[in-house]
């Protein structure tokens, strides 16, 4: 048993530690808040090539505690929460049969650009269903990503209808596959993370609006910081095990902080006057719909929980509001101001009495 575990540890590809990543604080914060509260709705990360987008996203999964699942279940079903459980397991539970469980690492699923709809959603064996009357379902990537993270690199190059499917599943928490009158559904609640380079094309505004947060990252200009980043990467490439060991304490501290924030989240309160001001900011920025208001409220609570507070302060809102609103503003070709700066300016104006 021990030798097998040792072999498995040796064969696992080392992941660059999250806490060793230098700079890019906005991207790191967006990922942490989505992990604390997946209902924020995922994050879109846009930035230059070679700025550590993929490295950071893959590193976040390493910070998450193991999750309890129904053993040998195709959908990583939760053993008690019916909203995160397949219909088959739900029926087993209702029949009074105990479910066998096991612990697994939080799934981190990569969605390749060339993926088909069947690969994403899963397929039903129509022939078997018609001839033998057996509903056979081959799970797709959405099933594997349930209760985990689904990462789409170059999401701006993915087919729009696939992005739609991902966003629908992420919002509803369920994936339904229908073929020839036969229907199968399963839980598909995950944190959707997309990344891309704006030079290669933008997402449609309707799709962009569905992402909870939008982080923009730039190439680091400070020479000292660049040298530090190069050193960190060189150390990791030369001796990944040692680099991981050196960061073990900071990794564990952050892991504990995230776990505590997840427990604290449901008790966080946000005063009515602060909620009014959030909606005032959204109104003044002419944000369509109410997604901006909802996500900003959620993100502010997650940020307060991350800092171990019971109540949301205006400074907490200031830290997250740009991430939540910058991609929801209408594009104005004559506007000289960056959308993030515009959000911050309106926030400062409305919250100035408290600052």
Curated annotation (Swiss-Prot):
Task: State one molecular function term (GO).
Answer: magnesium chelatase activity
EC number(s): the record gives 6.6.1.1
Q: Give its localization.
A: Plastid, Chloroplast
Which gene is annotated as encoding this protein in its UniProt record? chlI
Reaction catalyzed = protoporphyrin IX + Mg(2+) + ATP + H2O = Mg-protoporphyrin IX + ADP + phosphate + 3 H(+)
A GO CC annotation recorded here is: chloroplast
Decide whether keyword Plastid is in the record: yes
Q: Please give the CDD domains that the UniProt record associates with this protein.
A: AAA
Ligand binding (ATP):
47-54
User: What UniProt keywords apply to this chain's record, in alphabetical order?
Assistant: ATP-binding, Chlorophyll biosynthesis, Chloroplast, Ligase, Nucleotide-binding, Photosynthesis, Plastid
Q: Which residues cross the membrane?
A: none
Asked whether the keyword Plastid is assigned, the reply is yes
Q: Kindly give the SUPFAM superfamilies that the UniProt entry links to this protein.
A: P-loop containing nucleoside triphosphate hydrolases
Return the protein name.
Magnesium-chelatase subunit ChlI
